[in-house]
């Protein structure tokens, strides 16, 4: 009898990560670290706020500055070098004035001139932004005014119709005036009786003529008596 050897099970080879995936994971890790760093405000802003909040006449010392930053939740021990660099950069820019010591180991005070100069441009920008908003709002008012003008233009059409009706009524009124003028013909009729009166007076003038025969008869009677 021939013996059959058991078949060897093939073990899967370990899958190597592609270099593209490694780069992607590194980028993601770097982005996460950058986000963590960017979440908090920069050191320069924290330093300026701490110095501005101090009421010391001679300025805020480095030790007092570190205490103020630590009270605000900033890790002073890890970021000691950053604090020193931030102080030097702010002094070079003119934001802070060094009243004592040299370098980062001294007392620092806020430069009022620089602070006022920074505040003025911000105020100008805010004023310009406010001025732009009304400029954008004016066209709406102009549109409303234009709509009102259109409404005013439409109204005269309605006003014209009553005017035309008034003209028609005025045109009809002369007919009534003509009807009122007809009674003038009736006034002419009294003139006819005036012409008739002289005709009636003629018989009165004829009566004396009738008296003449009486006189003749009287003369004849007188002659007979003789």
Curated annotation (Swiss-Prot):
Modified residues (Phosphothreonine): 11, 39, 138, 155
GO cellular component: chromatin; chromosome; euchromatin; heterochromatin; nucleolus; nucleoplasm; nucleosome; nucleus
Composition skew (Low complexity), residue ranges: 1-16
Tissues/organs with expression: Ubiquitous. Expressed in the majority of the cell lines tested and in testis.
Subcellular location, record wording: Nucleus; Chromosome
Modified residues (N6-acetyllysine): 17, 49, 78, 168
Family annotation (Gene3D superfamilies): Winged helix-like DNA-binding domain superfamily/Winged helix DNA-binding domain
Domain spans labelled H15: 39-112
Modification type Phosphoserine: residues: 2, 18, 173, 189
Signal peptide boundaries: none
Keyword Transport belongs to the record: no
Ranges where the record places region Disordered: 1-44, 98-226
GO molecular function: chromatin DNA binding; double-stranded DNA binding; histone deacetylase binding; nucleosomal DNA binding; RNA binding; structural constituent of chromatin
Cited InterPro entries: H1/H5, Histone_H1/H5_H15, WH-like_DNA-bd_sf, WH_DNA-bd_sf
Any one GO biological process: protein stabilization
Location of N6-methyllysine modifications: 27
Superkingdom: Eukaryota
The protein's assembly and partners: Interacts with MSX1.
Protein function: Histone H1 protein binds to linker DNA between nucleosomes forming the macromolecular structure known as the chromatin fiber. Histones H1 are necessary for the condensation of nucleosome chains into higher-order structured fibers. Also acts as a regulator of individual gene transcription through chromatin remodeling, nucleosome spacing and DNA methylation.
Family designation: Belongs to the histone H1/H5 family.
Protein name, entry field: Histone H1.5
